[in-house]
């Protein structure tokens, strides 16, 4: 009989400086513990992104522990009052400056491809993941990293670049 998997750790982490992000929330439906084959929906909201030195939000990367499989996007982040463009789900992207990204959503700015969106948020998104088949407890960690256009190489005057 398969053992019930447990969450080794669950973390919604961010690479953007805490002075750039605020009002985060997340839910997992259903709540754990999980067994192989369980499908979990994650809803995440970043309430506000305040870029320093005109630093704009550019991407949300989703990092999963080895116990998850079948990452599927459901709800794309909005772009309230932001730059012309759209959010694109991408499994892997290398930005012109060499920064590797993915999987997750990245903003495609139609006015300047190297820039993110000028929107301050809120940014709400959701995705589904499945507990992988296994007989032993596996790492079911989840983290969401927020990247700005300074980190991705499209802008070079930001206070959050080195985070």
Q: Could you tell me what each predicted segment is?
A:
Residues 1-25:
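Bacterial Sec-dependent N-terminal signal peptides
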């Amino acid at each position: 009989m398969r053992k019930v998997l447990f969450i080794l750790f669950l973390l919604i982490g961010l690479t953007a400086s805490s002075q750039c992000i605020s009002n985060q929330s997340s839910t997992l439906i259903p709540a754990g513990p999980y067994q192989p084959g369980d499908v979990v929906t994650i809803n995440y909201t970043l309430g506000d992104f305040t870029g320093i030195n005109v630093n704009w939000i550019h991407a949300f990367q989703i990092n999963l522990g080895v116990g998850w499989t079948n990452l599927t996007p459901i709800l794309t982040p909005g772009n309230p009052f932001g730059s012309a463009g759209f959010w694109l789900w991408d499994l892997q992207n290398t930005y012109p400056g060499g920064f590797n990204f993915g999987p997750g959503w990245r903003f495609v700015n139609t006015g300047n491809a190297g820039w993110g969106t000028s929107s301050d948020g809120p940014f709400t998104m959701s995705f589904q993941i499945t507990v992988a088949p296994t007989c032993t407890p596996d790492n079911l960690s989840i983290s969401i990293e927020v990247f700005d256009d300074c980190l991705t190489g499209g802008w070079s005057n930001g206070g959050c670049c080195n985070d």
